[in-house]
Every structure is written in structure tokens, then in C-alpha cells.
């Protein structure tokens, strides 16, 4: 018999004595509770013991709120019913309160105080403070459910849904509790859906044992009262056993593969005692993830041990076979621990003790117990007892009795107090780098580490050499959307060259690559016996030449500088005018582990292929290989050129502080203004952002006001109908201002371009346009072609004029401009420009010439050019003819353009119609050529056909072969309004001249010298469309023309500075027109109405009426009274030579099979103007 007192979870035996009455034990309970911080310390020490035995996943921490001890398995800790309880043990939902356990074998700390000792009254309050973290206000959820069912009464049942609603608990938690109580034999589940739950009658509960969870386990269930306290132990029984089984299977698999070298899953399963392959498949996959095994083949796979796992097993077996690790030493090092089992007195029975088994660190003891009878049939609950806490000073643990003091650790777990012989096997076990094992040289280790990730390889090498390796962030710069990080490797205080990149990960990798390159060269020199000169290299020295054995690194900082390799390659190809393609060569491997093989193709050149587990990584690696190959080619070509200039780097972003090419920023105006602004800000080290200033309008038509901010400077606000469009327009406006300021700074000779605040550039642009001395002799575009200069002049003028206008009014930047050069050496000046891509609707035609029928950019720029010619003719005087662009023609009746003066047309894309009717694959590269000969393409009969524009839309359709005579009333009633395409009109200009019929009364024909395109350029298709299709059959057409008309063949080409890529979506309906005579006043039209954009629908200055008005003024100024009384149509017909040439031109097109030229209704030209007096 044993004398003891009962604790919250069992008996703490001290000496043998008959068991006392439970009431007596209950009266003594409150005196025998552990006090205050002493209880906390002992509980903490028990948690240390559990951690050392491997039952806790983490070491307990003193001073922190530690979790309670895990529920004790019935097979490990004996449980006994405690004294009768009159209350419930408070606990947090689902987590029982931690309790203090004691037994004779694990008594830790000072001896127990006498049972009648009491502390001072102040100790209770301080003890409460020390146990404040253990307070709880919740209740056992199982007890809540039992109480609720008891309230219903015996024989009453309810559903889980009703319980969940009454207890305000999720239904899934209630279901889990109900089924747990059913397994314990406390509840009865009725049939039906949903099942009805009720309490088990008392008589049935006495005879019905709890249901076993797992019959093949030899550990009995705990008592119902403690199960309600600690929760359902089923999960605790299943987890460790399954883990042990998994570990055992893994060990058997590895041992078998170590002996046979390879095997299939089925063969493995049969040789380790299992039946089917599926029993080991999951374990094999887990081992494969851990890097212990690998497989080859697909159906079925053959499994092998990895080299590293085989080395570890070999080392383990050699260690176990050594003299130090003998079985006697191992058995001597561990002690068996037995837990006494005490049962309540049973009639005619004897208490059975659990068989003691050896417990090793990190394993769960599996102990078999004999069956025992329950002491009481009903549930017995523990009750919290009031007691006086210990002194508060015990909460501060003294150093000599600290949580890890060796005296408090049990002897079987205390390695310090253990005899030296017990752990001799462990202490004498050779380490991985023991001198008894061969150790590789630093050079060999570095070579192995270079095959891995640079950061991981460097850390592994530092650990190999017992050194510390740190990655220090030296500097962080750049805007928030594209920061720059500079990292440096420091090994044992030695600093290596830093590396900079756009992300911390890439910067660390680059710094690790540099450090490993230096260490590799030093180790190689040391192994070869050479003096270690490289080890004394200064920190600033950046080893650019890699070692011979160094494999290519995963990131090339000199090439990409933090950018994606794919992005860098595409930018490089774009600058070179080439297009690259990523080709998927093959796809191998299963679906869960594919291998993609990619290569980069640039034209006919193919770069080395690479393989990777994903398409994205494969493309990046292929781009890296292509960039490295391109850089090597560039370096070789630079070496071959003796005395040549330094070639620029492939990646211009390595020098972000240099001035960006304005052509690149102009490209963003036509593609992605947001990206262009961010690129501009990054190149200058500024941060860019877009702010929503205001939002108004109804939900179906909102208006968003956005404003761009770059480097603390706000740019003009814009208004749009969507947030996306608002950001684009704000970026567009900011780019125009910044580009204009950059151009001004370049023209004035500044070395660096900084954002300039202040006045508008309109006056500056006007002065530059009119003052030849203000122009620089050459454009600030090194190596640019003639067509690049034409394009730059056009965009400069457009940007300077529109930098203060809302971009939403300016269309999608389909720009056309006419540039005038006074001599071949002149840089040129823009005399007219226009934007737009719309035609007037049929219901907006005017009988008075008040609408502009065609608002395409090319047509608008030509009408502005006509206005420029009128202004120059009004200024012409034979006394000042030296400064004029005109001179007297042969016969003296008319004027003509001077021989040195030339006009050049720029269009940002191919003209609509036949000039753009080809596949983009036929596009030609920009080549500087002095040859002006044309090579038109005639591949099929449809090429060269006349085409008309689509009303209220974009694109063209071919004209019908039959005669079409559009009528005014037919169009008003809904007949399709036909407008000839821009390619057909440019063809007419190259035959009849740019001046038109009215100016032919005063001028000889004016022809274009060149045509420049920014996009969709094909020399064969463009020349066919704008001039060569009328000479397809020879010179017959040109021979039929009367003097002074000819077939003009202008020089054609495309720009190389930028390429305005295609944008999806329709262009806007607005159109801009300007000529040099207008100063810096822009006019914005609505292309579908043909009038000035706005509610007033004002008359445009490029309309027929206004141009006819200028013609009348010129007639009055030149004393041509015979033309003042004519209508618009009659005045055009009065130019007999022009009218005859036009009719011949139309007839020839019809005879050549190109179709009929469709004109507007004749009624539209029959309007008159009052005579204009000579001012």
C-alpha cells in the first residue's frame, strides 16, 4: 500500500501507507497544491524533460508564455480518478490548462513543504500575479455539450445544428465534439439524417466500455473524466506510430538500395516486407524531395540512391563498425525509466505495473499495459482548489537553480553528470571533416560550389573554411519603382568588390560571383605553388576576366544591370533594328517535372540552346546566351578595328546619368507614354507618380483629372474618361514638356540635360524656326540618317507646339509634316504639320465649303502647306526676291520654287491604301542609301488598285470597276460617302503637284523631294503606291503629260532612331493642323464633323471656304480681276493645264485597270464668295 496525496492528474507517492478516504483527501488537497512560481518552475522543468526526451518539438523558454504540456498518452502516463469535483476545471477552448506532475522518480527541486505550512497572506496576491498568464475564462467544449444535453433531460435528443446555434459555436466543431463523446461512450447517436444526439443512460454507461479508436494498438483508452480534460487521445496515438513507421520504411528502403544499387518500387516493397508498389511510392517521392533518392525512366521508374546519401550511409556504417561505438557502450549510455502504476483498491485484484522499456532521446516510448478496471462508472471531474501561492521572489530564477541547471535534470538525461564511458561512442564519433577522413582542397571545394547558386556556394565554402560570410548593403538608390541596391561580400573582415543590381537577390548573387572569382584564382595560385599576389588586390579592383575553370554565372551584371535578360535582349535588338525570336526546340519529361529547351534566333543566326524546368527560366537563360554571344562579337569587331572609336555598350542603361536619346523618348509618345515617362525619370534618378486630382461626371460618363509628378515637379493636368487613359495622357503631357526642354538644352549646347521649369517653348520654337542662325549646324543625333533628321524635326516641332495642350485632344499621334530645306546643307524647318485619321460623315457635308472632308494627317499637312504657300506668295516682291523661296518661271507669267529649295514629307506610318496594303514581314530595315532608284513590287493584280476610306472608321476598301458618280441627294439619303485613300492622293501629288488647282494660276507645280516613314515601310510597296504604278508599262503615261507636269519619283526611306509600334484600339476623332504662317497657334478639329472641335462648330482655317478666301485675296493682290467673280469650282476649272492633266491622270488610271477615281459631288464646289478688296 502506498501513502500519498492526489494531484490534478494522479497520485504523487512518497511512502507506503493504506489509501485514505476520498473526503479526507479532498480536505487535504488545497494544502498540497504547489505554490505560485514554484509550480511554474516545476512545470517548466517537466517541459524541459519532455523536450529532452523528444516529445516536444521546441525547447521551452523561461519568462515567455509557454504552452501547456501536451496531452499524455495513456500508454505513457497512468491516470487515476481524482477527488469528487463540484466545479469545472477552467481551460481555454480546446487547450487544457497545464498541470504539475510529480512522482518519485522525477522529483525535481527542493523538498515539498509540510502539509500544514502556510505562507503569509501577501504571498497569495503575488502568486496570482506570477500565474496571471494561466488564467482562463473559457470552458471545456465537451463539458459544455454535456451540460446542455443534461439540461434537456434524460431521454431527450437534439441535433448538432441546434447545439451549434445555442452554444454559438461552428457546426463542424460541434460535430467533432459529438463524435468524440460518442467514441468515449458518453453520448448516443440515433439513426436518421441529421442524427439525434442524447446522453447515454446511467445504467448503460456503467456496463458499456468506451469504443476503441484503433484495435491494433495495445494501449488502452483513458478514463472518460480525463479524456474530457485532455481531449480525445486518438490523434495522439496515431501520429507518432505513423511517423515511426514512415521512418522505419525510409531506413529500410535506403539500406536496401545501398546494397543493390537500383531497384523498382515493386521489388523494393517485396524486399522490405510490403506487398505492393503503392505502399512505398509515397515514401520514395518523399525521399526524392529530400535528395536521398532519384529515379530514371517512366514506366516503371528505377530508383537509385544519390551519391550524397550513399556517402552518408557509408560513413554511418563505418562509424558503427568502429571500436568506439560498441553495443555495450550504447546500452550503458542509456537507462531505462519505469513509471509506477497505482490502481485504486480492487477486491481480489492486484495492481499491475507497466513493463519498463528503454527510452532514447528523440523517440516515443511504446509501453504495453495490462487491462485495468474502472474505479467508478460515472464521469469524475476535477475541481479547481484554492491555495496560497508561493513567494513572488521565486518567480526570479536564481542562476544556481536556473532552468538549465544540471542538478535539476534527471540523471538519465544529464550528459554532464554521466560517466565518461557512457557517451564515449558519441564523443569519439568522427565528424564530417575529421582528420581521419580525406578532406578536399579549397580549390576543389570552390570548383564544386561554383556549380551551385552563387550565394549558397559562397556560404558553403565559408562554412567549409570555418569563416564568417556576410552580405552588407552598402547603398540603395533610385526611385521606388526601380531601385538600385549595392551589396558587398565580407568574409572574416575581408571586403570584396561590391555589385549593384535592380534587386537585392541579384545584387547578392553578383557580389557572390565576384568574391568567388577572386577566391578561386587565389586558391588555384596556391595549389599551383605560385605566390599569392591576388590575395592582396585592393577592394576596388573588379575582376572582369573569369578564371578558366569558372563556369558561366547565372547572372551577368555587365550585360543586364538588374534588368531581365529577355528585356535587355529585346531592347538591344530594337536598337539594332533587328527582330529576335524565342524558339521552343523540345519538351521532355513528365508533366510534374518538364524540361523545356529554348534558343534565340535573330534572322538566320541561331544562338546556343538551353534547357530549364519552366518556359520563363528557359527564355531568360537563352537570352543570356544570346547577349553574351553578341557582346563577344562586338568585342571582337572592336578589336579588329585599329584606331576606331569606342563602341557603345549594348545596354545603354549602364550609364543612367547620361542623356537619353530623344528619339527613344519620342518613340514612347507613340507607344506607351507611361513607360516613357518612367524611363525618363529613372535615367535622371527621379521618382515618377500619377495622382488623381479630381473625379466628376455621372457613372456612365465619368471624368478623371490626372497629373504627373517627376522629381517633385508637377506637370499639366489632363482630363480623361478612364483612369488608364488619364495616366497615359498625363504622361504624354509631361513627356512633351521634358523632351522640349531637353531639345532646347541641346541646341544651346548644354552638356547635361536637367528638367527646366519656367516658360513655354512656343516662342523659342518660333524663333528657332525663323532664325537660321539660331539652329545648330547638325542635329544632336550622332550617326543619324537623313530620314532620322526629317523625323526629328517633325516631332520636335509637334512637341514644342503641343506641350501645353491636353493630349486627349491630339489624337493617337499619327503625324504628318512637310519640311522645307533652302539648300542641301540646311537642316530644314517644318512648314506644315497635321494629325488625324478620320473622314467626315455624309450628313456633315457642306454646300458652302465649310467642312474639311478628309482629316487624315497627310491631307491636313498638305492643306496647311497650301496655306504656307499663300502666305509666302503674299510676301513676294521682286525687290526682295533674294530672301524668297520663289523665282520667276520661264516666260515670266508664273513663279516657281527655287532650284535649291526642297520639300520633304514625313508620315509616322505608311499611308492608308495601297501603300500600307502588305504584310509586315515585308518591312525593310532603315538603310542609309544614296541611290534614289525605285524597285516597285507588282506581285498580283490587286496591287496598285485604287482604294477608298471607310466612312466614320479606319482602313480602306477597293473601288468598284463600274462608273460611280456620287450625288448629293444620294449621300444625304444614306449612300456611302467615298474618299480616296492617302496613297492615291500622294500619287496625284507626284503627278499634278502639291499646290493644287487654284495655286496653278500663279505657280508652277511643286513636287516632293523625299518621303519618310516611321513605321510599316516597304520600299517596293511604297514606291508602287505613290508614284511607280502609273509607269508600270513604261513611259507611255509620262509622255502623255503636258508641260510642266511630270511623274515625280521622290526619295523614300524610313527612320532608324525609333519605330512607332502598333497600338490596339481606334484613333481619336480629333485632328490638329498648323503651318509656319500661324505662328504658334494650333487648331483642333473634329474629324467626323470637319469643323473646329467645340460647341460652336467654328469654320476651320483649312476648309475650302477659307482657302478660297485666301485665293481671292491673292487674286486681288496680284490684280487678277478675272478670277474674282468665279465660284470655287469654276476657279479650279479655269486652271486649264491643271484640269487637263487631272482628267488625263484619272483616265489613265482607269485604262490601266486600277479603277475609277471617285470625287465628291459637284454640288459641293459650286459656292461663291463676295469679292475681297485689296488691302
Curated annotation (Swiss-Prot):
The modification Phosphothreonine is found at residue 754. The modification Phosphoserine is found at residues 228, 235, 431, 564, 579, 586, 760, 769, 771. The keyword Zinc applies. It holds the Pfam family A_deamin. Residues 135-204 are annotated as: Interaction with Z-DNA. Its main location: cytoplasm. One of its GO terms (cellular component) is nucleus. Residues 214-224, 357-376 have a biased composition (Basic and acidic residues). The keyword Transcription regulation applies. It is an enzyme of class 3 (hydrolase). GO terms for biological process: adenosine to inosine editing; apoptotic process; base conversion or substitution editing; cellular response to virus; defense response to virus; definitive hemopoiesis; erythrocyte differentiation; hematopoietic progenitor cell differentiation. Detected in brain. Keywords: Antiviral defense, Cytoplasm, DNA-binding, Hydrolase, Immunity, Innate immunity, Isopeptide bond, Metal-binding, Methylation, mRNA processing, Nucleus, Phosphoprotein, Repeat, RNA-binding, RNA-mediated gene silencing, Transcription, Transcription regulation, Ubl conjugation, Zinc. This is Double-stranded RNA-specific adenosine deaminase. It comes from Rattus norvegicus (Rat).
Amino acid at each position: 500500500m502506498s501513502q500519498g496525496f492526489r494531484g490534478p492528474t494522479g497520485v504523487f507517492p512518497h511512502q507506503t501507507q493504506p489509501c485514505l478516504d476520498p473526503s479526507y483527501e479532498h480536505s487535504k488537497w488545497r494544502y498540497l497544491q504547489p505554490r505560485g512560481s514554484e509550480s511554474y518552475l516545476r512545470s517548466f522543468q517537466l517541459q524541459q524533460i519532455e523536450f529532452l526526451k523528444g516529445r516536444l518539438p521546441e525547447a521551452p523558454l523561461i519568462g515567455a508564455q509557454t504552452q501547456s504540456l501536451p496531452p499524455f498518452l495513456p500508454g505513457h502516463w497512468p491516470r487515476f480518478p481524482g477527488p469528487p469535483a463540484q466545479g469545472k476545471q477552467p481551460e481555454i477552448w480546446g487547450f487544457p490548462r497545464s498541470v504539475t506532475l510529480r512522482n518519485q522518480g522525477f522529483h525535481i527541486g527542493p523538498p515539498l513543504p509540510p502539509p500544514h505550512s502556510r505562507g503569509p497572506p501577501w504571498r497569495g496576491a503575488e502568486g496570482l500575479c506570477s500565474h496571471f498568464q494561466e488564467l482562463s475564462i473559457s470552458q471545456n467544449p465537451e463539458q459544455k455539450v454535456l451540460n446542455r444535453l443534461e439540461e434537456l433531460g434524460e431521454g431527450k435528443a437534439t441535433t448538432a445544428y441546434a447545439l451549434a446555434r445555442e452554444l454559438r459555436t461552428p457546426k463542424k466543431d460541434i460535430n467533432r465534439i459529438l463524435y468524440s463523446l460518442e467514441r468515449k461512450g458518453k453520448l448516443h447517436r440515433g439513426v436518421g439524417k441529421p442524427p439525434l444526439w442524447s446522453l447515454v443512460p446511467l445504467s448503460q454507461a456503467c456496463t458499456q466500455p468506451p469504443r476503441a479508436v484503433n484495435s491494433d494498438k495495445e494501449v488502452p483508452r483513458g478514463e472518460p473524466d480525463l479524456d474530457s480534460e485532455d481531449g480525445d487521445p486518438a490523434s495522439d496515438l496515431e501520429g507518432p506510430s505513423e511517423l515511426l513507421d514512415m521512418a522505419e520504411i525510409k531506413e529500410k528502403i535506403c539500406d536496401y538500395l545501398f546494397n543493390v544499387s537500383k531497384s523498382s518500387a515493386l521489388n523494393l516493397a517485396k524486399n522490405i516486407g510490403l506487398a505492393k508498389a503503392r505502399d512505398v511510392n509515397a515514401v520514395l517521392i518523399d525521399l526524392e524531395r529530400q535528395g536521398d533518392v532519384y529515379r530514371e525512366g517512366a514506366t516503371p521508374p528505377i530508383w537509385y540512391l544519390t551519391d550524397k546519401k550513399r556517402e552518408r550511409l557509408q560513413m554511418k556504417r563505418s562509424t558503427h563498425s568502429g571500436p568506439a561505438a560498441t553495443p555495450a557502450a550504447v546500452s550503458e549510455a542509456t537507462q531505462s525509466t519505469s513509471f509506477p502504476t497505482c490502481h485504486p483498491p480492487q477486491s481480489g485484484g492486484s495492481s499491475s505495473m507497466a513493463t519498463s522499456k528503454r527510452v532514447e532521446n528523440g523517440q516515443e516510448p511504446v509501453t504495453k499495459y495490462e487491462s485495468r478496471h474502472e474505479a467508478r462508472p460515472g464521469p469524475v471531474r476535477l475541481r479547481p482548489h484554492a491555495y496560497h501561492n508561493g513567494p513572488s521572489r521565486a518567480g526570479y530564477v536564481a542562476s544556481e537553480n536556473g532552468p538549465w541547471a544540471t542538478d535539476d535534470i534527471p540523471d538519465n538525461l544529464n550528459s554532464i553528470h554521466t560517466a565518461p564511458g557512457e557517451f564515449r561512442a558519441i564523443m569519439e564519433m568522427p565528424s564530417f571533416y575529421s582528420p581521419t577522413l580525406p578532406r578536399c582542397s579549397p580549390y576543389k571545394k570552390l570548383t564544386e560550389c561554383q556549380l551551385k547558386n552563387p550565394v549558397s556556394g559562397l556560404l558553403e565554402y565559408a562554412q567549409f573554411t570555418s569563416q564568417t560570410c556576410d552580405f552588407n548593403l552598402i547603398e540603395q538608390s533610385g526611385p521606388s519603382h526601380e531601385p538600385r541596391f549595392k551589396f558587398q561580400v565580407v568574409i572574416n573582415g575581408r571586403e570584396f568588390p561590391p555589385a549593384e543590381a535592380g534587386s537585392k537577390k541579384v545584387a547578392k548573387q553578383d557580389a557572390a560571383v565576384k568574391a568567388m572569382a577572386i577566391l578561386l584564382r587565389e586558391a588555384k595560385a596556391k595549389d599551383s605553388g605560385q605566390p599569392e599576389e591576388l590575395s592582396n588586390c585592393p577592394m576596388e579592383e573588379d575582376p572582369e576576366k573569369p578564371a578558366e575553370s569558372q563556369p558561366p554565372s547565372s547572372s551577368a551584371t555587365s550585360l543586364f544591370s538588374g534588368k531581365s535578360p529577355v528585356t535587355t535582349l529585346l531592347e538591344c535588338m530594337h536598337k539594332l533594328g533587328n527582330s529576335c525570336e524565342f524558339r521552343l526546340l523540345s519538351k521532355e519529361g513528365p508533366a510534374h517535372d518538364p524540361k523545356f529547351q529554348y534558343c534565340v534566333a535573330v534572322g538566320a543566326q541561331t544562338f546556343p540552346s538551353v534547357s530549364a524546368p519552366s518556359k520563363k527560366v528557359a527564355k531568360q537563360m537563352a537570352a543570356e546566351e544570346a547577349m553574351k554571344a553578341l557582346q563577344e562579337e562586338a568585342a571582337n569587331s572592336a578589336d579588329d578595328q585599329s584606331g576606331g572609336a569606342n563602341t557603345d555598350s549594348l545596354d545603354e542603361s549602364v550609364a543612367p546619368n547620361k542623356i537619353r536619346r530623344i528619339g527613344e523618348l519620342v518613340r514612347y509618345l507613340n507607344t506607351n507614354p507611361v513607360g516613357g515617362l518612367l524611363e525618363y525619370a529613372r535615367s535622371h534618378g527621379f521618382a515618377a507618380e500619377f495622382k488623381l486630382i479630381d473625379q466628376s461626371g455621372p457613372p456612365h460618363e465619368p471624368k478623371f483629372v490626372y497629373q504627373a509628378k517627376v522629381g517633385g515637379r508637377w506637370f499639366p493636368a489632363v482630363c480623361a474618361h478612364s483612369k488608364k487613359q488619364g495616366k497615359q495622357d498625363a504622361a504624354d503631357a509631361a513627356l512633351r514638356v521634358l523632351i522640349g526642354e531637353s531639345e532646347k538644352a541641346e541646341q544651346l549646347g548644354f552638356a547635361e540635360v536637367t528638367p527646366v521649369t519656367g516658360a513655354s517653348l512656343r516662342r523659342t520654337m518660333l524663333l528657332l524656326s525663323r532664325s537660321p542662325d539660331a539652329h545648330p549646324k547638325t542635329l544632336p543625333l550622332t550617326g543619324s540618317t537623313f530620314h532620322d533628321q526629317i523625323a526629328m524635326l517633325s516631332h520636335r516641332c509637334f512637341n514644342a507646339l503641343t506641350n501645353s495642350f491636353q493630349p486627349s485632344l491630339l489624337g493617337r499621334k499619327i503625324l504628318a509634316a512637310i519640311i522645307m530645306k533652302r539648300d542641301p546643307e540646311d537642316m530644314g524647318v517644318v512648314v506644315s504639320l497635321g494629325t488625324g485619321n478620320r473622314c467626315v460623315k455624309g450628313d456633315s457635308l457642306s454646300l458652302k465649303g465649310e467642312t474639311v472632308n478628309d482629316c487624315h494627317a497627310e491631307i491636313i499637312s498638305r492643306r496647311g502647306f497650301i496655306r504656307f504657300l499663300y502666305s509666302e506668295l503674299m510676301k513676294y516682291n521682286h525687290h526682295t526676291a533674294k530672301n524668297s523661296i520663289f523665282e520667276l518661271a520661264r516666260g515670266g507669267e508664273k513663279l516657281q520654287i527655287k532650284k535649291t529649295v526642297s520639300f520633304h514629307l514625313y508620315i509616322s506610318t505608311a499611308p492608308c491604301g495601297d501603300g500600307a496594303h502588305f504584310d509586315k514581314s515585308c518591312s525593310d530595315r532603315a538603310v542609309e542609301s544614296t541611290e534614289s532608284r525605285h524597285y516597285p513590287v507588282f506581285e498580283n493584280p490587286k496591287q496598285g488598285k485604287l482604294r477608298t476610306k471607310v466612312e466614320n472608321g479606319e482602313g480602306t476598301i477597293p473601288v468598284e470597276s463600274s462608273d460611280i458618280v456620287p450625288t448629293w441627294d444620294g449621300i444625304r439619303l444614306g449612300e456611302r460617302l467615298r474618299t480616296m485613300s492617302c496613297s492615291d492622293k500622294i500619287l496625284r501629288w507626284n503627278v499634278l503637284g502639291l499646290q493644287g488647282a487654284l495655286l496653278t494660276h500663279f505657280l508652277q507645280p511643286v513636287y516632293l523631294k523625299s518621303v519618310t516613314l516611321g513605321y510599316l515601310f516597304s520600299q517596293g510597296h511604297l514606291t508602287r503606291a505613290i508614284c511607280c504604278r502609273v509607269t508600270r508599262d513604261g513611259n507611255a503615261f509620262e509622255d502623255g503629260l503636258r508641260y510642266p507636269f511630270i511623274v515625280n519619283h521622290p526619295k523614300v526611306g524610313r527612320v532608324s532612331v525609333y519605330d512607332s509600334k502598333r497600338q490596339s484600339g481606334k484613333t481619336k476623332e480629333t485632328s490638329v493642323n498648323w503651318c509656319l504662317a500661324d505662328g504658334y497657334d494650333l487648331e483642333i478639329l473634329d474629324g467626323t464633323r470637319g469643323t473646329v472641335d467645340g460647341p460652336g462648330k467654328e469654320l476651320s482655317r483649312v476648309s475650302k471656304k477659307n482657302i478660297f478666301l485666301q485665293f481671292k485675296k491673292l487674286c486681288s493682290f496680284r490684280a487678277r480681276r478675272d478670277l474674282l467673280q468665279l465660284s470655287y469650282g469654276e476657279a479650279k476649272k479655269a486652271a486649264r493645264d491643271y484640269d487637263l492633266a487631272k482628267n488625263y491622270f484619272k483616265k489613265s488610271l482607269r485604262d490601266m485597270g486600277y479603277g475609277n477615281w471617285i470625287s465628291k459631288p459637284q454640288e459641293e464646289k459650286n459656292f461663291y464668295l463676295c469679292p475681297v478688296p485689296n488691302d
